[in-house]
Amino acid sequence: MTRSDLRVGMVGLGAIGLPMAVNLRRAGLGLKVHTRSRTTEQHPDLEGSQACSSAAEAGRDVDVLILCVSDDAAVDSVLFGRQGAAASLPNGSVVLDCSTIAPSTAVAAAERLRRQGVSYIDAPVTGGTEGARAGTLTVLAGGDAEALERVRPLLEIIGGAVHHFGAVGRGQQVKAVNQVLVAGSYAAVAEAMALGTRLGLPMQEVVAALSSGAAGSWALRNRADGMLAGRYPLGFRLSLHHKDLGIALKEADSVQLTLPISNLVQQQEAELIGRGHGDEDVSALHRLFDSIS
């Protein structure tokens, strides 16, 4: 089956899901779309897609149903809740779940779907809104290899790299590792920008110089300037990263491992959420230094 033959549904049209859906449409795929808020189904870049009133409608008569929703409860709701997709998915179809959820939630969903002849792949992505728009997301997949090959043509539209880590749940575990790295790198850049500013250094030159050295990172290259200007354009929502760190910390607990940096960053994010900054980018961690920098 060629990619143009695939019948595809998509549930979740948020900051990451919407540009993913737009890229699928631009690639010529017929697409059924649903989002729980119903606000973006008629987006002009989705012209030609079929807007669906429920996840069940989006999953009816499709070969692949893509999910990109906010958390474990949302995945459970759109699959198994009232008007959930599981009731309408055809035997032999594949659920491609690009949400970031607990590995145990992914495993449980896969088992429930398996009983009705539906395959499930956990395929969280990394790369933020920039990667979603450009179609260069990194896909971290867990699940049956044959099912993964069936959906690979879609993954190659939304992602620049597709990595398979084994059984269902492994993709989510790798995403947990990714979010630990994001926590440390963003927090370090925020601290470094605060220190350099307090010392009176020419920070644009500092960032340019350090970006090509051993301290260079994606966060430094792409978020330092915004931090210095007090601007935090949305790449990945701070509140969602806080949720993801909770998943990572639970995974660490399960193997008797303490993650002190991630614990601290999660506490800092909780403070910022309490101040009303949860919908800003993770780089808003720099706000913790506003009063001293």
Can you describe what each PLM-predicted range is?
Residues 1-67, 93, 98, 129:
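NAD(P)+-binding Rossmann beta1-loop-alpha1 motif at the extreme N-terminus of oxidoreductases
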Residues 31, 51, 120-121, 162, ...:
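Hydrophobic beta-strand scaffold residues
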Residues 38, 55-60, 64-65, 71-137:
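Rossmann-like NAD(P)(H) cofactor-binding subdomain of soluble oxidoreductases
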Residues 100-180:
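Rossmann-fold dinucleotide-binding core
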Residues 134-142, 167-199, 210-222, 240-243:
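Active-site-proximal catalytic alpha-helix in oxidoreductases
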Residues 172, 181, 216-281, 293:
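Interdomain hinge/lid region at the active-site interface
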